[in-house]
Amino acid sequence: MRKIVLYVSVVTLLVGAVYFLSYGQEKENAMPVLPKENAQPGPLQGYTILVDAGHGGYDGGARAGVSKVWEKEINLQMAGQFRQALEKAGARVIMTREEDKAFADKKRPDLDARLQMARDGQADMLLSVHMNQYHSAMESGPQVFYRKDQENSRLLSGCIQAAMISRLQPRKERKAMAGDYYMLSLDIPSVLVECGFLSNPEEEKMLLDDAYQKQLAEAVCEGVCEYFALKSTEKME
């Protein structure tokens, strides 16, 4: 009996020694994972973009007709999707808010605070995220707005509008529209993206869907990339 126990103990020690030596050899031969030297930077590398989730706090914005969700909540979700898409493309993203809050008790000071964030962060672009609403439930489709006196913003709005139509294929293909928007009063290209109509039950359902939000954000990012590509081409000419 003692011989059997001794034999089993010796075998166990031998097996353990072989495993230890082979494991040590594997670790010694393992190559560290290094970043690829030829990895290309994203198309938005070097750009800083401010993403503004419209409304917040006491200002709920529009309200969805079916779910009764406030616009401020969906804006925040969508702004997060914008951030992910833009950062994936290499941009540095500044968020005006990442929670339900306002920056002042009145509308104009609240907007001023958001604009100041863009100045302080030396943003190259401003994207303000909103949801639309109309008295008719038939209206649908995303739409981009810009200030009529800003040529770069007009170009940016056209790039984003075209990308959203191409990717999302909405029933109603809207055109980018000019207006007098205080939130877009910076010297940098600035647009207001109305992602869709909360007054349209079908579109409301889409706007609350995570997959659709991601798809829309990727379309916006594509438009932003196209804008900077066009501006780079202008500089080279």
Locations of regions flagged by a protein language model:
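Positively charged n-region of N-terminal signal peptides that target proteins for export
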Residues: 1-4
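Hydrophobic membrane-insertion alpha-helices, especially the h-region
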Residues: 6-22
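Sec-dependent signal peptide cleavage junction
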Residues: 20-35
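Catalytic-core regions of hydrolytic enzymes
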Residues: 31-49, 55-156, 166
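Active-site-adjacent mobile loop/cap segments within catalytic or ligand-binding domains
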Residues: 63, 121, 128, 135, ...
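Conserved beta-strand segments of alpha/beta enzyme cores
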Residues: 92, 172-175, 189
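Active-site-adjacent substrate-binding region
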Residues: 152-177
